[in-house]
């Protein structure tokens, strides 16, 4: 798969589809580009070219020393976009990816037609901060296999546990197989802890969709809604599921994203 050298790191990426407009998907903490498996085909079927990539610190991208920041990771995304000559594209970020997408939209609004901020926040509150701090501590003290097993009840809903035990087992197996080193996971956690766009949200004028999940316990609906209220051109959507709603309930999540992007395609304006 292709790799570009961008912003001082090697970024592993994949292009799917050949639509006349492009959407770039940004992963959450610890996820590589395979995490978007449930989104690729629906987005391609909607006429989009889809670009996925591994953030610094995970997958086949470089693993530079940490800690990382959301602003630094947004610069990685910008360097990738410039290398691929992207312009006027749609940007989608989930969790940590949503923090990165905020920084991108604030720094490079002219690049974007729209931005989707899913299961994310403008600044962590005390509860979310404490949870992410523990994730980093578990990874460094007990290793990534333990971290992946511990993480699951935080990111998947009780309903998903009850209805899809075999699928959950397969997902956990894949998470453990693809896990990054504990130190680079902790480096990504640092970006979650230090992110703060609260004083700048009012200047984010790119059309935005904020998605929250009704059973997300780590980035609660109320925390995402707090961000939504500060955005001048934002829409709001609630989908069923936990923090990983895009994995456990991909259909409503995908429909919300595609419907929003359709409103902001070039042909509409």
Where are the language model's segments positioned?
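Catalytic active-site module of serine/aspartate enzymes centered on a nucleophile-bearing elbow/loop
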Residues: 234-269
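Active-site loop/oxyanion-hole signature of alpha/beta-hydrolase fold enzymes
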Residues: 51-52, 56-92
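Gly/Ala-rich beta-loop-alpha elbow adjacent to hydrolase catalytic centers
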Residues: 93, 97, 101
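Conserved alpha/beta-hydrolase catalytic His-Asp/Glu region
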Residues: 126-128, 145-200
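Acidic catalytic loop of the alpha/beta-hydrolase fold
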Residues: 215-219
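Short beta-strand/loop motif that positions the catalytic acidic residue
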Residues: 204, 210-212
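Flexible "cap/lid" loop of the alpha/beta hydrolase fold
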Residues: 102, 106-107, 113-142
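Conserved HGGG/HGGXW glycine-rich cap/lid loop of the alpha/beta-hydrolase fold
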Residues: 9-62
